[in-house]
Amino acid sequence: MKRLKGLLVLALGFTGLQVFGQQNPDIKIEKLKDNLYVYTTYNTFKGTKYAANAVYMVTDKGVVVIDSPWGEDKFKSFTDEIYKKHGKKVIMNIATHSHDDRAGGLEYFGKLGAKTYSTKMTDSILAKENKPRAKYTFDNNKSFKVGNTEFQVYYPGKGHTADNVVVWFPKDKVLVGGCIVKSGDSKDLGFIGEAYVNDWTQSIHNIQQKFPDVQYVVAGHDDWKDQTSIQHTLDLISEYQQKQKASN
């Protein structure tokens, strides 16, 4: 009951969200805070349709996009929608790890003239896989200032992948968790083919210690409005480890 009450309060907090992009059923854009927007795109993985979430920030210099739409068929529709809504172009793109639902748009955004970024670790993985890479790379942690907006990229440790990072917007107290943070309605850890499950718990604790005053967490997939996602991720890791022990 306590968790249900918490979810009801959180749901009420999201009732004022503005939704855009409904003309394309595979792209949904929702205003979260001031100039910060959550965008959700849909794609199919192993026969099941999933939602992928990320954010973009509108600054006085242009638009900063974290990650990318999931599937290149959505790239142009996405940037067209941004320009239609805000009258600004994408000037920066940052990938939070090497998978296509995060780094898949690096080449597209680069061709638009945006500065593209990833960590050196992500860049190394993309190079080995012969995939398009960011123009600029950085070590695991980096602070950015774009016009009137500041944000921070933080590497908490291994989890969903070796290279997963999160992005923190301090003014809005919004954490973009990417795929290291599971949605509150996730039934399991999802794709773990490149995961480090035994390191994942500590990495989540590192996030909690680094950003103790988070107001909103945007999970990488499915329902991002359920703000129990951090604790739920820890629960899912524990459940997985217990099942592994029981099967050995």
UniProtKB/Swiss-Prot annotation:
GO function terms (MF aspect): beta-lactamase activity; zinc ion binding
The UniProt record lists the keyword Oxidoreductase: no
Gene3D superfamilies: Ribonuclease Z/Hydroxyacylglutathione hydrolase-like
Pfam families in alphabetical order: Lactamase_B (PF00753)
Residues reported to bind Zn(2+) 2: 101, 179, 221
Compartments reported by the entry: Periplasm
Record keyword Hydrolase present: yes
UniProt cofactor note: Binds 2 Zn(2+) ions per subunit.
Organism this protein belongs to: Elizabethkingia meningoseptica (Chryseobacterium meningosepticum)
Enzyme Commission number, as recorded: 3.5.2.6
GO terms for biological process, alphabetical: antibiotic catabolic process; response to antibiotic
Family: Belongs to the metallo-beta-lactamase superfamily. Class-B beta-lactamase family.
Major subcellular location class: periplasm
An annotated GO cellular component: periplasmic space
Function: Confers resistance to the different beta-lactams antibiotics (penicillin, cephalosporin and carbapenem) via the hydrolysis of the beta-lactam ring.
Name this protein carries in UniProt: Metallo-beta-lactamase type 2
Reactions it catalyzes: a beta-lactam + H2O = a substituted beta-amino acid
Record PROSITE patterns: BETA_LACTAMASE_B_1, BETA_LACTAMASE_B_2
Binding site for substrate: 182
Subunit structure: Monomer.
Signal peptide (residue range): 1-21
Cofactor(s), names only, from the UniProt record: Zn(2+)
The entry's keywords: Antibiotic resistance, Hydrolase, Metal-binding, Periplasm, Signal, Zinc
Protein residues bound to Zn(2+) 1: 97, 99, 160
PANTHER family: ACYL-COENZYME A THIOESTERASE MBLAC2 (PTHR42951:SF4), METALLO-BETA-LACTAMASE DOMAIN-CONTAINING (PTHR42951)
